[in-house]
């Protein structure tokens, strides 16, 4: 982290959490949070009460999601972005270590 008076620069590749899904808070803009997550373990199935943007900054992630009650999955590579609308059930399974930028409503699971 390089910090000035009005800017912060985060070097995502140098962030390592003490546990899976550890997060570094980057910003909270009117109740919308931006957090950098580090993980090497799957999350849990969940449904957000708001929209979610999930950007893979480093590594690969298999994202499972349900559309019309049917489970599907896709591999997200570094640079890929997953968008989940309100009410979309999903779960992320990193394939090794991954660093992920998540933008969502404050307090989301």
Label each region the model flagged.
Residues 17, 45-46:
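Short loop/turn motifs at secondary-structure junctions and domain boundaries
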Residues 30, 57-58, 77-78, 96:
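A cytosolic small-molecule/anion-sensing beta-strand core signal
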Residues 44, 53, 72-74:
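Short, surface-exposed secondary-structure edge patches
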